[in-house]
Swiss-Prot record:
One of its GO terms (biological process) is actin filament polymerization. It holds the Pfam family Strumpellin. Its main location: cytoplasm. Acts as a component of the WASH core complex that functions as a nucleation-promoting factor (NPF) at the surface of endosomes, where it recruits and activates the Arp2/3 complex to induce actin polymerization, playing a key role in the fission of tubules that serve as transport intermediates during endosome sorting. May be involved in axonal outgrowth. Involved in cellular localization of ADRB2. Involved in cellular trafficking of BLOC-1 complex cargos such as ATP7A and VAMP7. Component of the WASH core complex also described as WASH regulatory complex (SHRC) composed of WASH (WASHC1, WASH2P or WASH3P), WASHC2 (WASHC2A or WASHC2C), WASHC3, WASHC4 and WASHC5. The WASH core complex associates via WASHC2 with the F-actin-capping protein dimer (formed by CAPZA1, CAPZA2 or CAPZA3 and CAPZB) in a transient or substoichiometric manner which was initially described as WASH complex. Interacts with VCP, PI4K2A. This is WASH complex subunit 5. Belongs to the strumpellin family. The modification Phosphoserine is found at S917. InterPro entries: WASH_strumpellin. It is found in: Cytoplasm, Cytosol; Endoplasmic reticulum; Early endosome.
Length: 1159
């Protein structure tokens, strides 16, 4: 019969593909369960209030039109819904595809069963497939994996969350319009079961059997599979466990399959007492906690509670005397085998000869160890015992008492067993690889010895007192030929013949009285030894490795091992060299990957890589978690070193008097520093002792592991310091900003210095790591803060700054800001608020408007540079850009609302436009016209002023940041600054040349050069924030005249001061001049330049018309408003770096010259 798994056997390949797919689906479900967006859980009140109206469960399907009409009625809900869609459609689609795969899996399995019944596969029926060993395994696995999928989904992705995700996918995707979509079937299969994985939650009635029956499956198939699992050893595991007391361990995988599949036929669990008794007697006579798939544990006492037959059958196993007997037995076994293993692990004990002579004994010891570890780990696990279940608690307490359970001793047994297993495996692999070479070597040596003896008896080779003997000569030559004729490939015949040759050599020694000659005896003894070695070597079989692999399976502990993490870490803390022993345990755990990958590999599925990566990644993450104790301990020592160096040890001056030497010696503190440094070195040594290890398919390099661990610990501590150090009290007078920055600066300097100190002792690039990680923390926090202003947010798994191995921690927000960078920015904005402070441009300083006390100055930004570095200032700058964009967008919507939708304001503006046209003319009776328009539009200026001043305030801050960045760049990196400036000038020259002559080259759209150079220029402060275009705009009617009117409406609130320029007239009606000018300038910059032209022309017309009206007075005097307007034009030209002639185009130059002399 054709091999069932052969590539040309369609029947076998079809079911193999289904099973392979099943394993891949479970891996995907487990992977996705870690990425459920928190918002779908609707746990906290804020999420419920915000998203409650747009996230629906299956009640939505009762009347979708009703729900959608509610959404359509509220534009803000529509907007939120659209934003939610943009942010979550990618992850929701991924979940939907996983759910769809589960449904497709069972549809494919049902179709395969139908094909078998209909005879699609020639000469194959359900019965014949179940008779085949591989076919039987695959059919059982196919149904079992479907059950596991359903259980995993319910455990890892709550029913309500599934429903919300499916409804969201239905609403946001094209699935609803697709005719061939099986959305309905998927929803029916995965609707909420009412099950909750929370401890203490009640189990829903008829769960999980009603869930398992949502898609009908061929009943005779289920029945036959259960029959096979009840009667057969489908994986032939019993041969690896010959002892009867190990029978339940041998059949553990089959027992897990049977446990899951019985839910497809719950009548057996309920009423078939005989069958259940048979199942319990065969599979669960001495165990009741089982692992069903990759460490998912189930306690049968709890799981079978609702089923009468199952519960009754299990009572014998759970009889207190049986529980006591099992616990005591495993306690005794574990003590006995632990002593044996420790003996085996003694240096020099496991030699090749010893191993080859004692294979059965060593394998028995391994079996006992692994069986004891399995039973004790499963039956003492907290995850398998619901603390609210009294019976479970009693059984567990009984086990803990009778087995004298001590987690440390059990862990030590696991550690030693893993080490023992690892050494044995490595020895066997080595011996197998050298098997033929060694065998041939022994054969050659034995044959040569016989030839030499033949030569001795020929009389050719003189040997003391050996007489010539032609018979012996011929006999030894024959033996030599016989040895040479042994064939390695025919090991059975060779083994038999070797034994005969050994006997012949023993007999020849006795019959021919050869004992009298010691040299001849030695030759015979050597040859017999070589022949013995040949027998030993030929008996090295791969079956031993396979048995060790089966026996050493640790997949049941895939999750349970986590309960030993604290013990592992404590052991490492006490003795860092423990890491080398742990390596064997991690490798033993890696063998669990064989379970899900076997079928995927057999099917040559492309899923092999992603599934391997998932499980290997999970294991590597666990290894990192355990070994993280080393960087943690190093940092604890490091903090003590920092404290000693900063507070206790006095820095030695360059010149020192001899008599003061004792004062500076400080032997005590210096000895303490040396001791702590030595401890750090020991920890480093400990982790580096672990060789480069292949965990699954991921190579773990201990040096990289150490560096990543140090980075992780650094990130954790620095992120916490930044979070805690930048929390402000908005009511504090004066502001806490500068003291907190200084304090945080000292903390950051301490970290920086300690990192410099440690780098040589742990062989890392301290400064490089420091800069990379601090920049990552700041950039990530800026990104999170900017998410507030983005419609499509950057999720953690999309962020280029977030990492799974070295995660940046997230902290609960303490105010409206999400992160420390937001709090810092808002605190700066609060203390430099233009309504409260006055910015003096020449001094770069802010003063309180009422008390005239200094509030802050440009020193603030050098302090931020010292504390947070260039990354901090640059991040602050980026955040201000987002805030300006938001403010400008708000301004545009406000403009639409208060001006373009207000008939009265529009009529006033039309009248004014008519009165001032053409712009080059002088407006007659100007005062009356202007101030009448201002009076009619008075109500709109408050909101307008606030928006303009906010933008202006942020632009001033951006200028200050650019100055500080540019100064520090020129000071610290003059070559970088020069290179950037030259490259910038060269690029601008090339672009200008292209516009003069379009045949010259120009960077294309797909060329990232301009974007990349912009990032560098902004980081080096080589840019002008006032020239930046923040938003795209459309044409706005009345825009220039509204801005002009706004400006002249503000001028009466200001007065000119010779020393300070324009200042606020009354603190009760606050207006700050620099933010006002810069805010208007920035606003106009966002629109076409003709708007600016019109705006300047209107100011020029206002100045000329007002001056014209003044000259008719007896004593002509320049009005204050004209002075303000002239100063605005001057400042406008200065800030935009435009020549004065731009202003003179609208105002005669003699007025400009005159007004300065009059002031």
């Amino acid at each position: 019969m054709l091999d069932f798994l052969a590539e040309n056997n369609l029947c076998g390949q079809a079911i193999l593909r289904i099973v392979s797919c099943g394993n891949a689906i479970i891996a995907e479900l487990l992977r996705l369960s870690e990425f459920i967006p928190a918002v779908f859980r609707l746990k906290d009140r804020a999420d419920q209030q915000k998203y409650g109206d747009i996230i629906f469960d299956f009640s939505y399907f009762k009347g979708p039109e009703l729900w959608e009409s509610k959404l359509d009625a509220k534009p803000e809900l529509q907007d939120l819904d659209e934003e939610f869609r943009e942010n979550n459609i990618e992850i929701v689609t991924r979940f939907y595809l996983a759910f769809q795969s589960v449904h497709k899996y069972i549809v494919d399995l049902n179709r395969y069963l139908d094909d078998l019944n209909e005879g699609v596969y020639i000469q194959q029926t359900l019965e014949t497939v179940l008779l085949n060993e591989d076919g039987k395994q695959l059919l059982c696995e196919a149904l079992y994996l479907y059950g596991v999928m359903l259980l995993v989904i319910d455990q890892k992705i709550e029913g309500e969350v599934r429903e919300r995700m499916l409804v969201s996918y239905y609403r946001y995707s094209a699935a609803r319009s697709s005719a061939d979509s099986n959305m309905d079937d998927i929803c029916k299969l995965l609707r909420s079961t009412g099950y909750s994985s929370q401890p203490g939650a009640r189990r829903p009635p008829n769960y999980p059997e009603s869930y398992f029956q949502r898609v009908p499956i061929n009943e005779s198939f289920i029945s036959m599979v259960i029959g096979r699992l009840r009667s057969d050893d489908i994986y032939n595991q019993v041969s690896a466990y010959p002892l009867p007391e190990h029978r339940s361990t041998a059949l553990a995988n089959q027992a897990a399959m049977l446990y899951v599949i019985l839910y497809f036929e719950p009548s057996i669990l309920h009423t078939h007492q005989a069958k259940m008794r048979e199942i319990v007697d065969k599979y669960f006579p001495d165990n009741w906690v089982i692992s069903i798939y990759m460490g998912i544990t189930v306690n049968l006492v709890d799981a079978w509670e609702p089923y009468k037959a199952a519960k009754t059958a299990l009572n014998n196993t759970l009889d207190l005397s049986n529980v006591r007997e099992q616990a005591s037995r495993y306690a005794t076994v574990s003590e006995r085998v632990h002593a044996q293993v420790q003996q085996f692990l003694k240096e020099g004990y496991l030699r090749e000869e010893m191993v080859l002579d004692n294979i059965p004994k060593l394998l028995n010891c391994l079996r006992d160890c692994n069986v004891a570890i399995r039973w004790l780990m499963l039956h003492t696990a907290d995850s398998a015992c619901d603390p609210n279940n009294k019976r479970l608690r009693q059984i567990k307490d009984q086990i803990l008492t009778d087995s004298r359970y001590n987690p440390r001793i059990l862990f030590q047994l696991l550690l030693d067993t893993a080490q023992f297993e690892f050494i044995l495996k490595e020895m066997f692999k080595q011996m197998l690889s050298e098997k033929q070479t060694k065998w041939e070597h022994y054969k050659k040596e034995g044959s040569e010895r016989m030839t030499e003896l033949a030569d001795v008896f020929s009389g050719v080779k003189p040997l003391t007192r050996v007489e010539k003997n032609e018979n012996l000569q011929a006999w030894f030559r024959e033996i030599s030929k016989q040895i040479l004729s042994l064939n390695y490939d025919d090991s059975t015949a060779a083994g038999r013949k070797t034994v005969q040759l050994i006997q012949a050599l023993e007999e020849v020694q006795e019959f021919h009285q050869l004992e009298s000659n010691l040299q001849v005896c030695q030759f015979l003894a050597d040859t017999r030894k070589f022949l013995h070695q040949m027998i030993r070597t030929i008996n090295i079989k791969e079956e031993v490795l396979i048995t060790m692999q089966i026996v050493g399976d640790l997949s049941f502990a895939w999750q349970l091992i986590d309960s030993f993490t604290s013990i592992m870490q404590e052991s490492i803390r006490v003795n860092p060299s423990m890491v080398t022993k742990l390596r064997a345990t991690f490798l033993k755990l890696a063998s669990a990957l064989d379970l899900p990958l076997l079928r995927i590999n057999q099917a040559n599925s492309p899923d092999l890589l992603s599934v391997s990566q998932y499980y290997s990644g999970e294991l590597v993450s666990y290894v990192r978690k355990v070994l993280q104790i080393i960087p943690e301990s190093m940092f604890t020592s490091l903090l003590k070193i920092i404290k000693l160096q900063t507070h206790d040890i006095i820095e030695v001056p360059t010149r020192l008097d001899k008599d003061k030497l004792r004062d500076y010696a400080q032997l005590g503190p210096r000895y303490e520093v040396a001791k702590l440094t030595h401890a750090i070195s020991i920890f480093t040594e400990g982790i580096l002792m672990m060789k480069t290890t292949l965990v699954g398919i991921i190579k773990v390099d201990p040096k990289q592991l150490l560096e990543d661990g140090i980075r992780k610990e650094l990130v954790k501590r620095v992120a916490f310091a930044l979070h805690r150090g930048l929390i402000f009290n908005p009511r504090a007078k004066p502001s806490e900003l500068m003291p907190k920055l200084k304090e945080l600066g000292a903390t950051m300097d301490g970290f920086h210095r300690s990192f410099e100190y440690i780098q040589d002792y742990v062989n890392i690039y301290g400064l490089k790591i420091w800069q990379e990680e601090v920049s990552r923390i700041i950039n990530y926090n800026v990104e999170q803060e900017c998410n507030n202003f983005l419609r499509t947010k950057i999720q953690d798994w999309q962020s280029m700054y977030q990492s799974t191995h070295i995660p940046i921690p997230k902290f609960t927000p303490v105010d409206e800001s999400v992160t420390f960078i937001g709090r810092l920015c808002r605190e700066i904005l609060r203390i430099t608020d233009p309504k409260m402070t006055c910015h003096i441009d020449q001094l770069n300083t802010w003063y309180d408007m009422k008390t005239h006390q200094e509030v802050t100055s440009s020193r603030l930004f050098s302090e931020i540079q010292t504390t947070l570095g260039t990354f901090g200032l640059n991040g602050l700058d980026r955040l201000l850009c987002f805030m300006i964009v938001k403010e400008l967008q708000n301004f545009l919507s406000m403009f639409q609302k208060i001006i373009l939708r207000d008939r009265t304001v529009q009529d006033t503006l039309k009248t004014l436009m008519n009165a001032v046209s053409p712009l080059k003319s002088i407006v007659a009776n100007s005062n009356k016209i202007y101030f009448s328009a201002i009076a009619k539009t008075q109500k709109i200026w408050t909101a307008y002023l606030e928006a303009i001043m906010k933008v202006g305030q942020m632009q001033i801050l951006r200028q200050q940041i650019a100055n500080e960045l540019n100064y520090s760049c020129r000071f610290d990196s003059k070559h970088l600054a020069a290179a950037l400036e030259n490259l910038n000038k060269a690029l601008l020259a090339d672009i200008e040349a292209h516009y003069q002559d379009p045949s010259l080259p120009y960077p294309k759209e797909d060329n990232t050069l301009l974007y990349e150079i912009t990032a560098y220029l902004e980081a080096a402060g080589i840019h002008n924030p006032l020239n930046k275009i923040y938003i795209t705009t459309k044409r706005l009617p009345y825009f220039p005249i509204v801005n002009f009117l706004f400006l002249i409406a503000q001028l009466p609130k200001l007065q000119y001061n010779k020393n300070l320029g324009m200042v606020c007239r009354k603190p009760t009606d606050p207006v700050d001049w620099p933010p006002l000018v810069l805010g208007l300038l920035t606003l106009l910059k966002q629109f076409h330049s003709r708007y600016t032209e019109q705006f300047l022309a209107l100011i020029g017309q206002f100045i000329c018309s007002t001056v014209e009206q003044c000259t008719s007075q007896k004593i002509p005097e320049i009005p204050a408003d004209v002075v303000g307007a002239l100063l605005f034009l001057e400042d406008y030209a200065r800030y935009t770096k435009l020549p004065r002639r731009v202003a003179e185009a609208h105002v005669p130059n003699f007025i400009f010259d005159e007004f300065r002399t009059v002031l």
